[in-house]
Amino acid sequence: MSEYREIITKAVVAKGRKFTQCTNTISPEKKPSSILGGWIINHKYDAEKIGKTVEIEGYYDINVWYSYADNTKTEVVTERVKYVDVIKLRYRDNNYLDDEHEVIAKVLQQPNCLEVTISPNGNKIVVQAEREFLAEVVGETKVVVEVNPDWEEDDEEDWEDELDEELEDINPEFLVGDPEE
């Protein structure tokens, strides 16, 4: 007859993933003639579980290098973009104990410029960006294991004897080099 035990342990009890594409408009001081480059830096975020979702609140800086004055001068304009991504969770565990949990948010795709263009009216810069997150909720859950009544504990002394024999075979002089003068 088998015997079962219930064990409470921590495990990933829910997961979610979200891919986002967004468009941001930047207003430079001077009217742009052409776009020379665009990049995103300084990405920071925090994650919090709210109900059956994880809310990721963060920001990043968009830098756009552009020319103006009929392509005779250049400048870099920077704008901080704030965002909130709400990730729906898929629960994998019906035995999840909702008292305490830990939220782990991982960036699968750092915010990245897809395309940087000049707006149709010619005085703004339009930046298309993308980002992707994976969110996991780690919480306490209950698992049931079968107890093996025939199990015997291994003798640790045998393992220690084998380790002692291996240590005896080591040459203690292998690290010693020629004495320095």
Curated annotation (Swiss-Prot):
InterPro entries the UniProt entry points to: Spore_coat_CotE (IPR018901)
According to the record, the residues making up region (Required for oligomerization) are 58-75
Which keywords describe this protein according to UniProt?
A: Sporulation
Q: Which domain of life is it from?
A: Bacteria
Protein's job:
Morphogenic protein required for the assembly of the outer coat of the endospore. Is also a regulatory protein for the expression of cotA, cotB, cotC, cotH and other genes encoding spore outer coat proteins.
Family recorded in the similarity comment: Belongs to the CotE family.
Q: What is this protein called?
A: Spore coat protein E
Look up and give the organism this protein is from. Answer: Bacillus subtilis (strain 168)
Traced from the root, the source organism's taxonomic lineage reads: Bacteria, Bacillati, Bacillota, Bacilli, Bacillales
Name the encoding gene, please.
cotE
